[in-house]
């Protein structure tokens, strides 16, 4: 019988996660989440009827958590892409601060929590829409479309357009024309917004093997597509006013914002080379964020004005 010395045995120490709270917050894509929360809030407040403030808060919280879960699962699947892109190389997974299994578990737990909580406390119709939104973003867009087609952001944009629809369903228990209009505005806003980004980040996307439109069709075709989608966006965003769904404050603001965005888009279309072209794309990308926030802020203002008028009547 032999004696085994203690130094002959190597014990593998369990891996201790180096992730901080900030790393897990980064997995949620907080900047994207802020836009989701705001558009969802507008959808919820525009919905007819009354929803208890606690249930309203719960609805927005669940939608926000669901959006964050989608972001975490997106980063889990795209760690190889993120590592190759300057814009995303410092994210928690490529930097080794969060492991892929940790990100996957985090995303799945948050997805389950957000859907089940919304279903139990608010209604299962809204919960089903939230589950579909998460599925569409993670499976249809992230896993399938993004690496396969240059139209990834066009089709995948539906996921980003659904939060106000989910919020409306949470408040009203059903859907009508208005949430579909909100969906259409965000849906047609998404391609010019992301293609403007892709124009000045084309090298990043090419290095990562992502078939964004500037990589597959070239910058000139992308500029034309941005122009065409912006024209459609301006028309779709304005339409609710003459159709009688939103009021004059919204309609006039929509025209002003749309006109400015169209001017910036024409500038992108005209400037084809050099630093001026890159600056034009950056300006359009930045303004497009302001455009959507401002448009939905005016809708929120209309809700407040209607409430004040109703209280005084």
From Swiss-Prot:
Task: Tell me its EC number(s), please.
Answer: 2.5.1.141
Write out the catalysed reaction. Answer: heme b + (2E,6E)-farnesyl diphosphate + H2O = Fe(II)-heme o + diphosphate
PROSITE patterns (alphabetical): UBIA (PS00943)
- Which family, according to UniProt? Belongs to the UbiA prenyltransferase family. Protoheme IX farnesyltransferase subfamily.
Extract one GO cellular component term from the record.
Answer: plasma membrane
Q: Recite the UniProt keywords alphabetically.
A: Cell inner membrane, Cell membrane, Heme biosynthesis, Membrane, Transferase, Transmembrane, Transmembrane helix
- Class of the enzyme per the UniProt entry, highest EC level: transferase
What pathway does this protein act in? Porphyrin-containing compound metabolism; heme O biosynthesis; heme O from protoheme: step 1/1
Q: Where in the cell is it found?
A: Cell inner membrane
Name the domain of life: Bacteria
**Spans through the membrane:** 35-55, 56-76, 98-118, 120-140, 153-173, 180-200, 226-246, 248-268, 285-305
Q: Which GO terms describe its biological process?
A: heme O biosynthetic process
Q: What is this protein called?
A: Protoheme IX farnesyltransferase
What topology does the record note for this protein and the membrane? Multi-pass membrane protein
Please name the InterPro entries in this protein's record: Protohaem_IX_farnesylTrfase (IPR006369), UbiA_prenyltransferase (IPR000537), UbiA_prenylTrfase_CS (IPR030470), UbiA_sf (IPR044878)
Note, other: Carbon 2 of the heme B porphyrin ring is defined according to the Fischer nomenclature.
């Amino acid at each position: 019988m032999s004696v085994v010395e203690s130094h002959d045995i190597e014990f593998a120490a369990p891996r201790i996660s180096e992730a901080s709270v900030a790393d897990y917050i980064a997995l949620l894509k907080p900047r994207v989440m802020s836009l989701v929360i705001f558009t969802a809030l507008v959808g919820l407040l525009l919905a007819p009827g009354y929803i208890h403030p606690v249930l309203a808060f719960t609805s927005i919280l669940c939608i926000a958590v669901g959006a964050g879960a989608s972001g975490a699962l997106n980063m889990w699947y795209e760690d190889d892409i993120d590592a190759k892109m300057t814009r995303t190389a410092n994210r928690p997974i490529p930097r080794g601060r969060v492991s892929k299994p940790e990100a996957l578990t985090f995303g799945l737990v948050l997805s389950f929590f957000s859907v089940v909580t919304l279903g139990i406390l608010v209604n299962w119709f809204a919960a089903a829409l939230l589950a579909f939104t998460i599925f569409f973003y993670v499976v249809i867009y992230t896993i399938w479309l993004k690496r396969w087609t240059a139209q990834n952001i066009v089709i995948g944009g539906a996921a980003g357009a659904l939060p106000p629809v989910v919020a409306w369903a949470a408040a009203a228990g059903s859907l009508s024309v208005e949430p579909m209009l909100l969906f259409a505005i965000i849906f047609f806003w998404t391609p010019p917004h992301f293609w403007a980004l892709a124009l000045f980040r084309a090298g990043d996307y090419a290095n990562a093997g992502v078939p964004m439109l500037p990589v597959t069709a070239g910058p000139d075709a992308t500029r034309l597509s941005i122009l065409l989608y912006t024209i459609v966006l301006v028309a779709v965003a304005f339409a609710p006013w003459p159709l009688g769904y939103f009021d004059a404050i919204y309609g006039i603001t929509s025209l002003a914002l749309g006109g400015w965005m169209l001017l910036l888009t024409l500038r992108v279309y005209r400037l084809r080379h050099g630093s001026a072209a890159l600056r034009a794309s950056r300006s359009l990308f930045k303004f497009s964020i302001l455009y959507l926030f401002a448009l939905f802020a005016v809708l929120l203002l209309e809700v407040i004005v209607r409430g004040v008028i109703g209280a005084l009547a």
